[in-house]
Swiss-Prot record:
It is an enzyme of class 6 (ligase). Gene3D superfamilies: 3.10.20.590, HUPs, Isoleucyl-tRNA Synthetase, Domain 1. SUPFAM superfamilies: Anticodon-binding domain of a subclass of class I aminoacyl-tRNA synthetases (SSF47323), Nucleotidylyl transferase (SSF52374), ValRS/IleRS/LeuRS editing domain (SSF50677). The gene is leuS. It catalyses: tRNA(Leu) + L-leucine + ATP = L-leucyl-tRNA(Leu) + AMP + diphosphate. A motif ('KMSKS' region) lies at residues 580-584. It comes from Dehalococcoides mccartyi (strain ATCC BAA-2266 / KCTC 15142 / 195) (Dehalococcoides ethenogenes (strain 195)). GO terms for molecular function: aminoacyl-tRNA deacylase activity; ATP binding; leucine-tRNA ligase activity. Keywords: Aminoacyl-tRNA synthetase, ATP-binding, Cytoplasm, Ligase, Nucleotide-binding, Protein biosynthesis. HAMAP family: Leu_tRNA_synth_B (MF_00049_B). Disulfide bonds: none annotated. ATP binds at K583. A motif ('HIGH' region) lies at residues 42-52. The lineage of its organism: Bacteria, Bacillati, Chloroflexota, Dehalococcoidia, Dehalococcoidales. This is Leucine--tRNA ligase. Belongs to the class-I aminoacyl-tRNA synthetase family.
Length: 813
């Protein structure tokens, strides 16, 4: 056995052997229960950073633990490889996105292997390869067949200087990322998925073990609101429409409406605007189109608008109210029109003050004296100035007003959602082509399944304008209609990259299957994912889209389950000097350098020790060095010869108790994903074992068994050194095929406990007592303590409270 531990040599040796033996390949013929462990796959940016390791390592530790506990564990790996960065690299470095991406895959694959994770590399998927995106296109066709994919006009970002469409990612602070010209908005035909059809299901997380912050974010993203749709009479000869509809969550305030605001994009704006107001309205619309939705909805931005010159009539009281346009109203939410009730809405109150619009109080605050309000009153109260509803509590009035509106045909109860359909069109090259064809005779025609995949052409010219090169590639664009055989053109938009990541977890179950996107039997065996780990930033994108996708496939009969991920865990982030790591700050930690310096296992153990996994922690080079030294001490603990001296029954009992207590603690902590305390417990155990070794009072057999137990618990944390130590104990290969140690509750019990004695909640004594002490004995001992008696002042205690094995609290009045 080597005298000094060489981590790099040992780690490479075992990584090579594990790979050659396909140790971590998981099949479907195992009698063991399955466990599907998955971490969100990385984007092919080129290099793994320490954040990738922090996502992977604790998840790998848990997967290894499950394997040792008798589970058939699948832990696949792959690469999210379509997207805008590859296209930007093509322009910047004059290299094809495919070459840039696959070079990055090769490098990142090498880096991932150094983690020493139990990845099943037989299951690797790369989303930019035709054998993968063929099925992405197939899913698009299935969604189209089901009526869930449709084409409609939608606003896009436009750079007037480049004369090009820009992706949202290419707009920086409202300007073009290349020329810094202020961007505007234009309407273009785009492809959407009807994710809104699943709004109610997507806000329901029953049966899922997910963080509350994620489920709350998804519920808020869906934004379900109960209210009423109300119609206001429109008297405008230029508009054939006779009314404008609004959605409101406050029908109880309908009598307080003093203005209406339409979104600048509302189809009625052009029709109802009077000639004298047209110039101002047109200028305002032009200005609003230069703003992103985020800017328009910002709570910090002052709300403004322009009067159209038109009026509508509030049918409940006959009041004529002016119609304005304002960019804080979005056409895509509700009806694209809102009623202004300044007395009871903070935003409306500010708007009314700015433009000197009336404020009518219709919900009276407590002790209201009839004076004008100094701010919007948004709480509950009694209805006033509300016709037949005067004197009603407004909570009751909501229901009655809705009934009144429905009775007169002026409105109805309805439910509204903030959620909008998923726009999947991208005007770029490096994505899965949308498999649709446009024929002058037949219209929009889907590509036949037998003709999939629609391949990305290799001979493309990358332009800096922001438009897809596919648009100018005649060999790609020009095709024949599959229905009539006439001349036709292909769709030149590609799909949002989130489309690829919305089903990759399904492909992992049978990545080589070529008769469909997955083998139904293997899918049935593995899905759903038992533990999914990754960043919380994906709450309302990837995680949301994956759930929609799964539910849609279920409804199409393609799969038989509706949720992809049983348990979700979001890791925190590793920071340096209390700052998030970034290249610009020069504080990025490169794992390759760390592995070369101290080895993989030291990096793994330190990452798990640095802080609670869900919170992250502060990177510290000295902490990593300390972890390396600890592993060397563990190595010495195993390799330095043990020679028992005098046998001691007490030492044997204490060793067993120490081992069984540690097994219990580590098992419970791993189950709770508390890896920092797992590593701390291993450190404490190694220190205890060192003392037992020095005392040499336990038998050689007991010592050997303690080392085996320690190695097994070390294996998920530091798999390479654990494998080496196991081999050096002459144990059967591999340690990762063994069984996790079990604790005996009796052996784990302390013989002596520390009993806290309090009087009226104040600490008065600590007593070392036998672990099996009864309640009566504990109370009697506490009452007779010489340190406690003076605080009782000769009085009989009102009560004596006993917390078993921990505390006695004496209450004296």
């Amino acid at each position: 056995m080597a005298e000094k531990y060489n981590p790099q040599e040992t780690e490479k040796k075992w990584q090579d052997k594990w790979a050659a033996d396909r140790l971590y390949h998981a099949g479907e013929d195992s009698p063991k229960p399955k466990w599907y462990s998955l971490t969100m796959f990385p984007y092919t940016s080129g290099n793994l950073h320490i954040g990738h390791w922090y996502a992977e390592v604790p998840a790998d530790c848990f997967a290894r633990y499950k394997r040792l506990n008798g589970f058939n564990v699948m832990r696949p790996v792959g690469f999210d490889s379509f997207g805008l960065p590859a296209e930007n690299a093509a322009i910047k470095h004059h290299i094809h996105p495919r070459i840039w991406t696959l070079n990055n895959v090769e490098n990142m694959r090498r880096q991932l292997k150094t983690i020493g994770a139990m990845f099943d590399w037989d299951r690797e998927v790369i989303t930019c390869l035709p054998e993968y995106y063929k099925w992405t296109q197939w899913f698009f066709l299935k969604l189209y067949e089901a009526g869930l994919a449709y084409r409609a006009k939608a606003p896009v970002n436009w750079c007037p200087s480049c004369q090009a469409v820009l992706a949202n990612e290419q707009v920086v602070d409202g300007t073009c990322w290349r020329c810094e010209t202020p961007t505007t908005r234009r309407d273009l035909e785009q492809w959407f998925f009807r994710i809104t059809n699943y709004a109610d299901e997507l806000k329901d997380h029953d049966g899922l073990d997910w963080p509350e912050k994620i489920t709350a974010m998804q519920r808020n993203w869906v934004g379900k609101s109960y209210g009423a749709e109300v119609s206001f009479a429109l008297d405008c000869p230029a508009a054939p429409e006779q009314e404008i509809k609004v959605f409101t969550t406050r029908p109880d305030t309908i009598y307080g409406v003093t203005f209406m605001v339409l979104a600048p994009e509302h189809p009625l704006v052009e029709k109802i605007t009077t000639p004298e107001n047209k110039a101002a309205v047109d200028e305002y619309i032009k200005k609003s189109r230069a703003c992103t939705e985020i800017e328009r909805l910002s709570t910090e931005r002052e709300k403004d608008g322009v009067f159209t010159g038109a009026y509508v009539t509030n049918r409940v009281n006959g009041h004529k109210v002016p119609v304005w346009i304002g960019d804080y109203v979005l056409q895509s939410y509700g009806t694209g029109a809102v009623m202004g009730v300044p007395a009871h809405d903070e935003r409306d109150f500010v708007f009314a003050q700015k433009y000197d619009l009336p404020v009518i109080t219709v919900i009276a605050p407590p002790d209201y004296d009839g004076q004008p309000l100094e701010a919007a009153y948004i709480n509950e109260g009694v209805m006033q100035n509300s016709g037949p509803f005067n004197g009603l509590p407004n909570t009751e009035g909501k229901e009655k007003v809705c009934d009144y509106l429905a009775e007169h045909g002026w409105g109805k109860k309805t439910v509204n959602y903030k959620l909008r359909d998923w726009l999947i069109s991208r005007q770029r090259y490096w994505g899965a082509p949308i498999p649709m064809i446009y024929c002058e005779k037949c219209g929009i025609v889907p590509v036949p399944e037998k003709d999939l995949p629609v391949l990305l052409p290799e001979d493309v010219e990358f332009r800096s304008g922001g438009e897809s090169p596919l648009k100018y590639n005649e060999g790609f664009v020009n095709t024949t209609c599959p229905v009539c055989g006439g001349k036709a053109k292909r769709e030149t938009d590609t799909m949002d990259t989130f489309m690829c990541s919305s089903w990759y977890f399904l492909r992992y179950t049978s990545p080589g299957y070529d008769k469909g996107p997955f083998d139904p039997e293997k899918l049935r065996y593995w899905m759903p994912v038992d533990l999914y780990t990754g960043g919380a930033e994906h709450a309302v994108m990837h995680l949301f889209y994956s759930r929609f996708f799964t539910k849609a496939l279920r409804d199409m009969g393609i799969i038989d389950f509706g949720e992809p991920f049983k348990k979700l865990f979001n890791q925190g982030i590793i920071v340096s000097n209390h700052q998030k790591m970034s290249k610009s700050k020069g504080n990025v930690v490169t794992p390759d350098n760390l592995v070369a310096e101290v080895g993989t296992d030291a990096v793994r153990a330190y990452l798990m020790f640095v802080g609670p996994w869900d919170q992250g922690g502060e990177w510290n080079d000295s902490g990593l060095s300390g972890m390396s030294r600890w592993l060397n001490r563990v190595w010495n603990l195993f390799t330095e010869e043990y020679t028992p001296q005098t046998a001691s029954a007490e030492a044997e009992r204490e060793l067993k108790r120490t081992l069984h207590q540690t097994i219990k603690k580590i098992t419970m902590d791993i189950e709770r994903l508390r890896f920092n305390t797992v590593v701390a417990a291993l450190m404490e155990l190694s220190n205890s074992l060192a003392k037992f070794k020095e005392a040499a009072a336990v038998s050689a057999e007991s010592w050997q068994n303690s080392l085996k137990t320690f190695a097994l618990m070390l294996a998920p944390v530091a798999p390479h050194i654990a494998e080496e130590l196991w081999a050096n104990l002459d144990m059967e290969y591999s340690i990762h095929n063994q069984s996790w140690p079990k604790w005996d509750e009796e052996l784990a019990k302390d013989e002596v406990i520390t009993l806290i004695i309090q009087v009226n909640g104040k600490l008065r004594e600590r007593l070392e007592m036998p672990a099996g002490i009864s309640e009566d004995e504990a109370k009697e001992t506490a009452l007779n303590s010489t340190r406690v008696k003076p605080h009782l002042q000769g009085k009989t205690p009102a009560s004596v409270i006993y917390v078993p094995g921990k505390l006695v609290n004496i209450v004296v009045k």
